[in-house]
């Protein structure tokens, strides 16, 4: 297990470990960990911290409310954190910008979980200091909107309906893209849900330029292309795989 081996390596060299997990709807692949994978990860962390080694699990859950499995499945994963050893600090990084589609406001929150109050007492001032010195304050408008929607029953119910509609729309776009990819023979990395689908590519920069000439914009990364299905229509999701495949095949 590569994660387990890396944790052991860092534990020896650093005497402490920080692990960042972006799940569900991983950016950029759309991979999502199963409940069994989360159980295995918790076991690995507990094994590494049996001797009291300080460990921080930073859980980047920016896209958590777009998991196609629904609310209960994602919260069931989080409840596993109760099994973590005392030397583990779990930090949940929530993005209101994603969940509530408030991208321009960049609003989010951190929730720290630990079995020892002393760990939280140490984390809180350090967190406040680092956040205030780097970013000052979150926007008042963003904080107001999040609290207003979540604390007002009428708004909250309407929001839940809109969120479900957005999630269903993403699922439909993803299914269309993946189905068409199979038809044209375009390979994609394992995808479950999310805003992005990733296509393996040996020359991403060259393929990106070819696609731009056809007014198609994807993001070239290392050995892959990231397709943002959150930003394109259902019809475009059906059309893109063929265009991307043609652009990639020019290198063959």
Write out the residue ranges for each language-model feature.
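PLP-dependent class I/II
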Residues: 1-252
């Amino acid at each position: 297990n590569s994660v387990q081996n890396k944790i052991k390596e860092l534990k020896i060299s650093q005497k402490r470990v920080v692990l960042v997990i972006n799940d569900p709807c991983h950016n950029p692949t759309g991979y999502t960990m199963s409940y069994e994978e989360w159980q295995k990860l918790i076991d690995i962390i507990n094994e590494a911290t049996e001797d009291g080694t300080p460990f921080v699990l930073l859980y980047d859950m920016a896209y958590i409310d777009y998991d196609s499995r629904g609310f209960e499945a994602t919260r069931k994963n989080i409840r596993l954190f109760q099994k973590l050893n005392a030397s583990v600090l779990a930090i949940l990084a929530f993005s209101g910008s994603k969940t509530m589609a408030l991208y321009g406001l960049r609003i989010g929150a951190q929730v720290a979980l630990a079995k020892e109050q002393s760990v939280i007492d140490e984390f809180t001032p350090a967190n406040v200091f680092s956040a205030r010195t780097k970013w000052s304050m979150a926007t008042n408008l963003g904080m107001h909107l999040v609290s207003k929607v979540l604390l007002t029953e009428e708004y909250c119910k309407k929001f839940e309906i809109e969120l479900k509609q957005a999630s269903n729309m993403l699922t439909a776009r993803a299914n269309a893209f993946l189905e068409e990819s199979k038809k044209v023979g375009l390979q994609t990395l394992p995808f479950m849900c999310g805003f992005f689908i990733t296509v393996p590519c040996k020359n991403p920069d060259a393929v990106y330029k070819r696609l731009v000439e056809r007014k198609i914009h994807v993001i070239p990364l290392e050995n892959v292309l990231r397709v943002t299905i959150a930003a394109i229509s259902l019809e475009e999701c059906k059309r893109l795989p063929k265009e991307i495949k043609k652009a990639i095949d020019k290198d063959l």
